[in-house]
Amino acid sequence: MSLSVFWFLPTHGDGQYLGTNEGARPVDHAYLQQIAQAADRLGFGGVLIPTGRSCEDAWLVAASLIPVTQRLRFLVALRPGVISPTQAARQAATLDRLSNGRALFNLVTGGDAEELAGDGVFLDHRERYAESAEFTRVWRRVLEGETVDYEGKHVHVRGARLLFKPVQQPRPPLWFGGSSEVAQDLAAEQVDVYLTWGEPPAQVKEKIERVQAKAAAQGRKVRFGIRLHVIVRETNEEAWQAADRLISHLDDETIAKAQEALARTDSVGQQRMAALHGGKRDRLEISPNLWAGVGLVRGGAGTALVGDGPTVAARMQEYADLGIETFILSGYPHLEEAYRVGELLFPHLDLVVPEIPRPAAILAQGEHIAHQFVPQKVSQS
C-alpha cells in the first residue's frame, strides 16, 4: 500500500535537545518557512500545525506559508467551544480557496482543564465531546453547501450558510484523534481520517478495529493515520545514540515536573502515552524500535521510531498492514530531520507524493447584493 507522510511545524519551539534551552533555536517565520519549503520539495504530503496556548496560531501560520509552497497541504485545528462552527466553516472555505485546495482540518477538543478554562471552556470530558459532535455536524453541512437550522444542547444556529464554496468538494477532509469511547463514537459518525498517537502495534490494532466497527454500524468507512516522531540515521547504532543524545540534558526533576503537569489532563490518549514509560528512563523501548523517550517531557505524541532507513520503513509497514495510510512524523531539530527523513527513509517507502494542484476555476460573480445574494445577469427590457 502506498503511504502518505506528513511533517510537523514546531510553532511551540525547537532545538537539539529536549527539556532544556541548551541547543534551542528561535522559531520565527523565516525558520518555519525553511521547514515548510523543505517539506514541500522533499515530497511530504503535508504538515501538521499544532494548537494551544504554547503555540503560534495555526491558521495564521498556514495562511502565511501558502504563497511560499506549491504542493504542501496544511492540517490546522478546529476548536469547538472556542469558535462557532459557522465562522469556522467560513475560515475553512477561505483557507481552502487561498491555498487552491491544500487545506485539511483537525478537530481538537482539548484535554487540559486549566488551559480550556483560559479559553472560556468549562465543560467536562463527555460534554466537550457532545459539543464537538454538534459543532462538527453544523460545520460539515455548511461547508457542503446546505443552509442549516440546528438546535442542540451546545450549538444553536438558524439559516447558517456559506457564500464562498471551498475548492475541495464536497468539503475539505476532517481529521481527528481521540482514545476515549466518546471520542471514537464521534470519529465513527463524523470524521474522514482517525488519528492515533504512536502506541505499539497491538494497541493500535485494537483502536482501529473498534473505530472500524463503530463506523460500519453507521454505514461509514474511516481512514487511519498515526502521529510519531522519528530518529533515522545511516545505521541503527547511530540512531539509538541520537535518541540518547536527545534526552541527555534531562534531569529527574524536569521529568517529574512534566509528568505532574501532564497528569492533570483528562485526555485518555495522554494517559495511555504516559503509561508506556511510567516516567522512567529505564523502560523506553516499549516495542521493537519504538522509543518513548520524547514523552518524558512532551505532551501529546511521545514516541519515536528509531533506526536506519530500512528498519524504520519496516516498522512503518507493520502499522500500514493494520490499516494506517498516513504517517505524521517529526524530529528534533525539525529542519535537519526533515532532510534526514527525505534522504534516508523515503527511498525505502512506497511514497505518495502530491502533485502541484492545478489552479481552481474561481468564477467572476461581482459583489454580493446586501451581503446575501450572488448577483445575476439583468434581463434587458
UniProtKB/Swiss-Prot annotation:
Entry function: Catalyzes the desulfonation of aliphatic sulfonates.
EC number(s) on file: 1.14.14.5
Keyword Disulfide bond: no
Organism ancestry: Bacteria, Pseudomonadati, Pseudomonadota, Gammaproteobacteria, Enterobacterales
UniProt entry keywords in alphabetical sequence: Flavoprotein, FMN, Monooxygenase, Oxidoreductase
Native organism: Erwinia tasmaniensis (strain DSM 17950 / CFBP 7177 / CIP 109463 / NCPPB 4357 / Et1/99)
Name under which the protein is recorded: Alkanesulfonate monooxygenase
Subunit structure: Homotetramer.
InterPro entries associated with the record: Alkanesulphonate_mOase_FMN-dep, Luciferase-like_dom, Luciferase-like_sf, SsuD_RutA_monooxygenase
